[in-house]
């Protein structure tokens, strides 16, 4: 089975070694066929606390690290503008 990967934007970095990543997806509605946007929020492990709000990151599936955390940040693709 392949390891799942997602690309999303960090929306929260307030927890220690954990970030919340919002992954957006556009899919057709089952009945009407209109393209609608869906956003799913994943809690991901960030060992070095390197990610900040607004960063575009790649996450991959991992073993369960806590009750809700099953993803890990692999790399930061685009860092957010910070002063």
UniProtKB/Swiss-Prot annotation:
Q: Name one GO biological process term.
A: translation
- Which InterPro entries is this protein grouped with? NA-bd_OB-fold, Ribosomal_uS17, Ribosomal_uS17_bact/chlr, Ribosomal_uS17_CS
- Spell out the GO cellular component terms annotated for this protein, sorted alphabetically and separated by semicolons: cytosolic small ribosomal subunit
Q: Does the keyword Manganese apply?
A: no
Q: Record keywords: rRNA-binding included?
A: yes
* Alphabetically ordered keywords of this record: Ribonucleoprotein, Ribosomal protein, RNA-binding, rRNA-binding
Gene Ontology MF terms: rRNA binding; structural constituent of ribosome
What SUPFAM superfamilies does the record tag this protein with?
Nucleic acid-binding proteins (SSF50249)
What the record says about family reads: Belongs to the universal ribosomal protein uS17 family.
Q: How does it assemble?
A: Part of the 30S ribosomal subunit.
**Main role?**
One of the primary rRNA binding proteins, it binds specifically to the 5'-end of 16S ribosomal RNA.
Can you name this protein?
Small ribosomal subunit protein uS17
Q: What is the protein's species of origin?
A: Acaryochloris marina (strain MBIC 11017)
